From Swiss-Prot:
Belongs to the tryptophan dimethylallyltransferase family. Residues 1-19 have a biased composition (Basic and acidic residues). Coiled coil: none annotated. The record marks G124 as: Required for regioselectivity. This is Deoxybrevianamide E synthase notF. Addition of 5 mM Mg(2+), Ca(2+) or Mn(2+) slightly enhances catalysis (about 100-120%). Significant reduction of enzyme activity (2%-35%) is observed with Cu(2+), Zn(2+), Fe(2+), or Sn(2+) (5 mM). It catalyses: brevianamide F + dimethylallyl diphosphate = deoxybrevianamide E + diphosphate. Monomer. GO terms for biological process: alkaloid metabolic process. Brevianamide F binds at E108. Keywords: Alkaloid metabolism, Prenyltransferase, Transferase. One of its GO terms (molecular function) is prenyltransferase activity. The keyword Zinc-finger does not apply.
């Protein structure tokens, strides 16, 4: 016996049956974001921390959403941000100008984009205190040690400090060197780039927080009266004397940097907080000649890597995004200052080009990465250029959403009118991973360049 056919088109609800809610009817309030929920039960002990939270907390929450993290991870990372980074941002409004961002803000958010991959959120961070820049701590030494000690007490994934500690010992000013620079008339205002170290935090989808360290050798070289390149080469030699895992690739970098006068006050290094056998070493540089010819030269180490298929394939893709961004070519007037309000000098707006050479243990040659300067470029144009490039790579999950994602990150701004929400576009390429890109952002809610 078969069941009678149910015809849905003949079903009629009784006249007095309750109706489905219409779109116009009021909805239940949405759940609070992790930032809102945690802040409801947290008392910030100082007005400065509360103000920094207002400037960065909700924005960080939106970046977590843009990174497509699960709700448990959002709460976990927000808790870390609230309890360990907010207290280390120092006084508000800021007094210390950090080297890590174009505005001098001591915090910088970035999102990493790869094919078919979760967007990875990162934070660049220089801890600051009320003493930073004062006569007691003119070059911000104390907060670096304080945050390092604080992180060491947490249960962070694969957290290992000896490699970073070695770099710090080689490049951080001693107290006698601080006094020496002050006597020479080279106090904290003698050069705008006065940071000595900083941290980076990668927020992994599985909930792990990976830590990186950055060191800036220029002040040490100045105090010791030795060239920056000499100081760096000696530090790498001593740290690699037992394992010999960076020697060959670093030799290629050092030769090129010496012949091209690539070492300067903007050169710095970074490492991971992992065991030395798994360590990567990165050498960063900056150049005011923002031209395709210079980019191609630096990408190939002055022709030293011209025979490597991986390098040439990556350069071809780099030319694509360079052309789409339409960054004005030429020599930049940048002299190391900051662009932090609408009255900034014209020569502080345009940024230099930044690059790094990443050395993996035992590698034959370094992996180049370039940071294309888009600070000062129209934000919507940059977003559309990225979307077009990602579409050409077959990344629809990023290409289709990015302009809208950027607008959602900054709901109070019109991205067709702003020019400083995106600061850098980083690009690297390997045969195994393909194109690997990140976007670095203005990282506080206030848009510092608002017109009256």
């Amino acid at each position: 016996m078969t069941a009678p056919e149910l015809r849905v088109d003949t079903f009629r609800a009784p006249e007095d049956a309750p109706k489905e809610p219409s779109a116009q009817q009021p909805r239940l309030p949405s759940s609070p974001s992790p930032a809102q929920a945690l802040a409801s039960y947290h008392h910030f002990p100082t007005n400065d921390q509360e103000r920094w939270w207002e400037e960065t907390g909700s924005l960080f929450s939106r970046f977590l959403e843009a990174g497509q993290y699960g709700l448990p991870q959002q709460y976990q990372f927000m808790f870390f941000f609230m309890h360990h980074l907010i207290p280390a941002l120092g006084p508000y409004p800021q007094k210390w100008r950090s080297t890590i961002s174009r505005s001098g803000l001591p915090i910088e958010f970035s999102l990493n984009f790869q094919k078919g991959s979760h967007r990875l959120l990162r934070i660049g961070f220089e801890p600051v205190s009320f003493l930073s820049g004062s006569s007691q701590d003119p070059f911000n030494r104390i907060p670096i040690t304080d945050l390092l000690n604080r992180l060491s007490k947490l249960q962070l994934s694969n957290f290992d400090t000896p490699f970073f500690q070695h770099l710090l010992s080689k490049f951080q000013l001693s107290l006698s060197e601080v006094r020496q620079l002050q006597k020479q008339g080279s106090g904290p205002d003698a050069h705008p780039l006065k940071s000595q170290a900083a941290f980076g935090f990668d927020f992994n989808p599985d909930g792990a927080i990976l830590v990186k360290g950055y060191v800036f050798p220029y002040l040490k070289a100045k105090a010791a009266d030795v060239p920056v390149g000499t100081l760096i080469a000696e530090a790498v030699r001593t740290i690699d004397v037992e394992r010999n895992q960076f020697t060959h690739a670093f030799g290629l970098i050092n030769d090129y940097m010496q012949e091209s006068t690539g070492y300067n006050e903007y050169t710095f290094l970074s490492c991971d907080f992992v065991e030395t056998s798994e360590q990567r070493l990165k050498i960063y540089g900056a150049h005011t000649e923002v031209t395709w010819a210079k980019i191609a030269e630096m990408w190939t180490l002055g022709g030293r890597l011209i025979e490597e298929p991986e390098i040439i394939a990556g350069l071809a893709r780099l030319k694509q995004i360079w052309s789409l961004l339409q960054i004005g070519e030429g020599s930049r007037a940048f002299k190391g200052g900051f662009d932090y309000d609408k009255s900034s000098a014209t020569d502080q707006i345009a940024s230099p080009i930044i690059w790094n050479y990443e050395i993996h243990p035992g590698s034959r040659f370094p992996v180049p990465k370039f940071y294309l300067p888009v600070h000062g470029e129209n934000d919507l144009h940059v977003a559309r250029a990225l979307a077009q490039f990602w579409d050409s790579l077959g990344w629809p999950e990023h290409a289709c959403a990015y302009p809208d994602t950027l607008q959602q990150l900054y709901p109070d701004q019109d991205i067709s009118q702003t020019t400083r929400l995106q600061s850098w576009i980083s690009y690297s390429y390997t045969a195994k991973r393909g194109v690997y890109m990140s976007v670095y952002y203005h990282s506080q809610s206030t848009y510092l360049w608002e017109e009256d």
